């Protein structure tokens, strides 16, 4: 990138002028990560100061049985496979209540697209979880799952959302987005939910007063232009509804090759190289610069590792997600040493170590507690990372 274009982009960002598709592609083509990160950090600081948000949450994957065989997914199992499972509602409640003593504030629920599980299982699950943990927010189901519920129930998405909200739903999850462009999507997704239905369902959720996240799966067969177009579709929908709270870039993971049954389900692995730390940081920075109307950008440390997550906080991210606990979807495709859980104190240390002030939030980004920032004795930079 020549110096003149750099100055032009810097001026647009500092004037609060909206970046274009061409600007986004130019940013991805830049090899000056320090400059790009610094520019994104300006925007991040303007929006969120020196704060890094986190929450105390537990992920529940109540079934891994799925009709789809998406090319990136190691989580799904077919009916009858030996490690296929479906939890009883009582079991899901027991697992959730096990974290009650840790001041749990959110349950994050995502499942496979089970072919025979009745629709009523899902609102009943939410009702039981809400009854057992009335102070805990329920963030549940991707737009893909809602679309699946339409198929198995005969109800409309509007009717489904109404029933789920009555049962305690406070937010959808942001999954099922992957990459929206059909040029890529046709090769990685094996279900019927594409941009038209994904956006329809999130628009409906926003109309009903729900705030939702949005995601992007990157680092597989897509190109930077696909990432830019993905963000711009979401930005346009956000202009319309204002319902997205946070954008979450998710790094595609290669397969955990020693699966219990010896199978490698992650079909993209042979065709791809995992995104490097530098590519991850560039993706966070460009996302923060392009997605000017979303308040928050989250680094999901489970899919990036804690060191990359710390550095992402200097490249546009202002949220580190939470304690997580047993995120099966990624850990069925990850053998790279990322922990399965971080406690509150771990998160506080990581955030302070990166030079920021931790703020614990709930699902709605309401502040639960503000913590002191980094102390003078901390080292000057996060742990070194291989990029």
Regions found by a protein language model. Name each.
Residues 104-202, 206-214, 220-221, 296:
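Conserved SAM/AdoMet-binding glycine-rich loop
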Residues 57-59, 80, 110-120, 182, ...:
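Glycine-rich, proline-tolerant flexible connector loops at the mouths of alpha/beta enzymes
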Residues 156-160, 221-235, 304-314:
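Catalytic cores of alpha/beta
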Residues 35-79, 84-110, 172:
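N-terminal pre-triad scaffold of radical SAM enzymes
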Residues 96, 123-127, 161-162, 199-202, ...:
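Generic structural signal for well-ordered alpha-helices
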Residues 1-34, 94, 100, 238-387:
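Auxiliary Fe-S-binding modules of radical SAM enzymes
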């Amino acid at each position: 990138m020549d110096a003149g274009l750099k100055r032009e982009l810097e001026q647009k960002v500092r004037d609060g002028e909206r970046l274009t598709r061409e600007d986004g592609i130019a940013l991805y083509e830049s090899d000056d990560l320090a400059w790009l990160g610094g520019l994104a950090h300006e925007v991040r600081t303007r929006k969120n100061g020196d704060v890094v948000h986190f929450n105390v949450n537990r992920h529940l994957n109540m079934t891994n049985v799925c009709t789809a065989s998406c090319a990136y997914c190691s989580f799904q199992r077919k009916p009858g496979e030996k490690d296929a499972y479906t939890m009883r509602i009582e079991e899901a409640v027991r697992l959730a209540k096990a974290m009650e003593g840790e001041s749990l504030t959110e349950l994050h629920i995502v499942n496979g697209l089970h072919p025979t599980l009745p629709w009523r299982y899902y609102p009943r699950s939410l009702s039981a979880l809400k009854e057992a943990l009335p102070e805990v927010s329920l963030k549940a189901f991707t737009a893909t799952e809602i679309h699946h519920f339409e198929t198995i129930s005969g109800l409309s998405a509007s009717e489904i959302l109404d029933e789920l909200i009555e049962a305690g739903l406070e937010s959808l999850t942001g999954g099922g987005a992957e990459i929206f462009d059909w040029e890529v999507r046709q090769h990685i997704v094996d279900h019927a939910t594409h941009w038209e239905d994904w956006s329809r369902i999130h628009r409906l959720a926003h109309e009903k007063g729900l705030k939702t996240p949005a995601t992007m799966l990157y680092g597989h067969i897509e190109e930077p232009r696909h990432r830019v177009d993905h963000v711009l579709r979401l930005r346009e929908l956000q202009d319309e509804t204002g319902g997205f709270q946070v954008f979450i870039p998710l790094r595609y993971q290669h397969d955990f090759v020693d699966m219990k049954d010896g199978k490698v389900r992650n079909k993209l692995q042979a065709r791809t190289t995992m995104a490097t730390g530098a590519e991850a940081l560039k993706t966070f920075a460009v996302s923060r610069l392009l997605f000017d109307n979303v308040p928050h950008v989250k680094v999901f440390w489970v899919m990036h590792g804690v060191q990359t997550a710390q550095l992402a906080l200097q490249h546009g991210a202002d949220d580190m997600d939470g304690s997580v606990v047993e995120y099966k979807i990624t850990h069925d495709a990850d053998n790279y040493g990322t922990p399965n859980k971080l406690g509150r104190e771990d998160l506080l240390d990581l955030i302070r170590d990166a030079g920021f002030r931790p703020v614990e939030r709930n699902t709605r980004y309401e502040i639960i507690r503000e913590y002191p920032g980094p102390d003078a004795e901390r080292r000057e930079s996060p742990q070194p990372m291989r990029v």
